[in-house]
UniProtKB/Swiss-Prot annotation:
It comes from Solanum lycopersicum (Tomato). This is Monodehydroascorbate reductase. Coiled coil: none annotated. SUPFAM superfamilies: FAD/NAD(P)-binding domain (SSF51905), FAD/NAD-linked reductases, dimerisation (C-terminal) domain (SSF55424). InterPro entries: FAD-oxidoreductase/Apoptosis (IPR050446), FAD/NAD-bd_sf (IPR036188), FAD/NAD-binding_dom (IPR023753), FAD/NAD-linked_Rdtase_dimer_sf (IPR016156), MDHAR3-like_C (IPR048618).
């Protein structure tokens, strides 16, 4: 097969790829210089929609409605956008070999692609129950959610199993968002996770108690402290029951699993430095190999604010790291410099009529403020994290846009404060910074 050659290649077609393409266009990339190679069949889209509006029973989001960059208020980049800019969108193409020394990528179909500068935007893949050797984990109607194909399969199952029963395995982002959207589809939901409370990597027990209570009121049955150890099926291979480690057996027409993800670094193993499961980069997302950059979920980068190296799995960082890398690529070509990446960690979620945001670092002592009663009609609450006498993190449920900006600012500025002061003042403390 003929070899294709580009000045710049982005491998991966998710959020980072789409935002990188926009920055390449802003920086004046010439027609024919840039290619995006993606194993997905569609142009880059805003992935968070898949666990939210894509699954709504009415008024569901569909492509081309949520191509990047609409998630951050930007222009919607349809396939035509890439064509107009002279960017090659090479879809349904999986790269199976990467030789960084010879600057060559090879696809599953045997096509060869040469590049001068490579941006690795491969993201993560979901951990599957079969990875842990769970019996029956390959039964039909056990779903994972990462790509649009996964969401389409789940949509079909929701139609086929109207008013059925679901078991959601996992108490993180996917577990919480999908339990909510399954209830909106009038599906009976059991949610199972091993930890003592939901979202344990971010939530404290106090925050989690609100969401668990709220979900319970919405009809989600939460089972904590155990895991799925096996599945029984109907003769047609569809899942029938979920066996739990504590001996309980749950009926299920649909199972949705969200037990974490792992970075897709396999192509580059032994060729680039890795750290904390990801590809190690500097503050410009340059890897240990010249002319090779890594962005988004796959990059382990210096988090300047906290003087440490981290890997962050979140759409906000996927967008911003992609833009930073492309700015750095053009600056280095022009003999100029750009500022180091100075990221404020940010996480958010929306489910039912809830909406929370978190900024900063969840370390140190905590203080909960506001009304965190799940039975309250006017629930609105938050939490601060204090370390060495300074605020380092802030969480807010049901905040206004101004209040959300205020908690972001307080996490960035890190003003001194006492627990008593914050308990008394609550959100008003952040609002006056």
């Amino acid at each position: 097969m003929a070899e294709k050659s580009f000045k710049y290649v982005i491998v991966g077609g998710g959020v980072s790829a789409g935002y990188a393409a926009r920055e390449f266009a802003k920086q004046g990339v010439k027609p024919g210089e840039l290619a995006i190679i993606s194993k997905e069949a569609v142009a880059p889209y805003e992935r968070p929609a898949l666990s939210k509006a894509y699954l709504f029973p009415e008024g569901a989001a569909r492509l081309p409605g949520f191509h990047v960059c609409v998630g951050s208020g930007g222009e919607r980049q349809l396939p035509e956008w890439y064509a107009e800019k002279g960017i090659s969108l090479i879809l349904s193409t999986e790269i199976v070999k990467a030789d960084l020394a010879s600057k060559t990528l090879v696809s599953a179909a045997g096509e060869s692609f040469k590049y001068q500068t490579l941006v690795i935007a491969t993201g993560t893949t979901v951990l599957k129950l079969s990875d842990f050797g769970v019996q029956g984990a390959d039964s039909k109607n056990i779903f994972y959610l990462r790509e649009i194909d996964d969401a389409d399969q789940l949509v079909e199952a929701l139609k086929a199993k109207k008013n059925g029963k679901a078991v959601v395995v996992g108490g993180g982002y996917i577990g919480l968002e999908l339990s909510a959207v399954l209830r909106l589809n009038n599906i009976e939901v059991n949610m199972v996770y091993p930890e003592p409370w939901c979202m344990p990597r971010l939530f404290t027990e106090g925050i989690a108690a609100f969401y668990e209570g709220y979900y319970k009121n919405k009809g989600v049955n939460i089972i904590k402290g155990t895991v799925a150890v096996g599945f029984d099926t109907h003769p047609n291979g569809e899942v029938k029951e979920v066996k739990l480690k504590d001996g309980r057996v749950l009926e299920a027409d649909i199972v949705v699993v969200g037990v974490g993800a792992r970075p897709l670094t396999t192509l580059f193993k032994g060729q680039v430095e890795e750290e904390k499961g990801g590809i190690k980069t500097d503050a410009f997302f340059k890897t240990s190999v010249p002319d090779v950059y890594a962005v988004g979920d796959v990059a382990t980068f210096p988090l300047k604010m906290y003087n440490e190296i981290r890997r962050v799995e979140h759409v906000d960082h996927s967008r911003k790291s992609a833009e930073q890398a492309v700015k750095a690529i053009f600056a280095s070509e022009q003999g100029k410099s750009v500022d180091e990446y100075d990221y404020l960690p940010y996480f958010y979620s929306r489910a039912f009529d809830l909406s929370w945001q978190f900024y900063g670092d969840n370390v140190g002592e905590t203080v909960l403020f506001g009304d965190a009663d799940p039975n309250s009609a006017t629930h609105k609450f938050g939490q601060y994290w204090i370390k060495d006498g300074k605020i380092v993190g802030a969480f807010l449920e049901s905040g206004s846009p101004e209040e959300n900006k205020a908690i972001a600012k307080v996490a960035k500025v890190q003003p001194p404060a006492t627990l008593d002061q914050l308990a008394q003042e609550g959100i008003s403390f952040a609002s006056k910074i």
